[in-house]
A protein has these predicted regions:
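C-terminal structural segment of proteins
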Residues: 1-309
């Protein structure tokens, strides 16, 4: 199908884009990668009166690090993160593990991280990473700029704190400490489907004891969530040598954390190919496995750097 008739504007500066978004009398959508927007327009699920194409605003196509913070501009494509050295330290490794799960190469070449946050699909890898890693979303309008913590930005499936007059110009992630181990595992029906469940982990261990952990859950509720209850069960736990991902003893801290995440943190929404009980089971299993992956990564980093465990 063809989309309904709409007006098109391609500004060259952020102020021009903001002026267009300030016209509250029109239904307006912002176009960056367009990998979700264009499809929905073709299917007549959304009918914007004006499409503001920001691809000519070159200042938005920037990736920078300052003050231990990564800033990702609104036009930075998914594929920019496929190589782990694109971002310093363990954060780059985590991003590279996550991004390969996003659709396929042509979509990763056009779609953007910030576009994923704007769309706010519960199965988005980037959205869960933003919540788990305490990212901030930068929102501009004609009156100025505001920062919204990712944990407060997502309001539900496809709903966010962004106002119609605002443009997301960037998202900011704190860098992870060099001795942080990371893991990301995704389960989906076929390779190009949305995630049925996915888990992201960042883990720090000192002398065999877990001192810090972050667990992000993808498609485990109507919005991306951080598994705070599961994280609390891990602080102070002794893990010894990481178990094999597929052979985790039931009494191991990683297995217990998975059960807590499934029972207390997650609020799954049933889908055609994944009911609530199925998702809870998958969450429990994947949290344990991803923690194993992160622990092995942490051990590798510490051994390589010669640090004490």
């Amino acid at each position: 199908m063809k989309p309904a008739t709409f007006d098109y504007l391609a500004p060259h500066t952020v102020p021009e884009a903001l002026d267009a978004l300030a016209d509250s009398g029109r239904k307006t959508r912002v176009l960056a990668g367009g990998q979700s927007l264009i499809l929905e327009m073709h299917l007549h699920r959304i009918h914007p009166e004006l499409v503001v194409d920001i691809n000519r605003i070159t200042e938005l196509d920037t990736l920078s690090v300052a003050d231990h913070t990564l800033r990702v501009g609104a036009l930075v494509r998914h594929r920019a993160f496929e190589q782990e050295h694109a971002v310093p330290g363990p954060l780059g490794s985590l991003f590279s593990r996550a991004v390969v799960n996003i659709a396929h190469p042509p979509i990763r070449a056009r779609g953007t991280m910030v576009g994923s946050l704007a769309w706010a699909h519960p199965a988005s890898e980037w959205c869960a990473l933003a919540v788990a890693l305490d990212a901030d979303v930068e929102l501009h309008d004609t009156n100025g700029v505001r920062q919204v913590a990712a944990r407060d930005y997502f309001r539900g499936a496809m709903r966010t704190a962004r106002r119609p007059c605002e443009l997301i110009t960037s998202v900011r992630f704190p860098l992870l400490d060099d001795d942080t181990g990371v893991g990301f595992i995704e389960h989906r029906r076929t390779h190009f489907c949305f995630a049925q469940v996915a888990v992201a982990v960042a883990l720090t261990v000192r002398d065999g004891v877990i001192t810090k952990t972050r667990i992000g859950l993808v498609n485990a509720a109507d919005r991306p969530i951080r598994a705070h209850a599961a994280e609390q069960t891990l602080i102070g736990a002794e893990i010894g040598a990481p178990p094999a991902e597929y052979r985790i003893p039931e009494d191991h801290p990683f297995a217990r954390a998975g059960q807590v995440a499934a029972e207390y943190d997650a609020a799954p929404v049933a889908e055609s190919y994944a009911g609530v009980d199925y998702k809870r089971h998958a969450i429990a299993i994947l949290v344990g496995r991803t923690l194993c992956q992160a622990a092995a990564d942490e051990r590798s980093r510490t051994t390589t750097s010669g640090g004490a465990r």
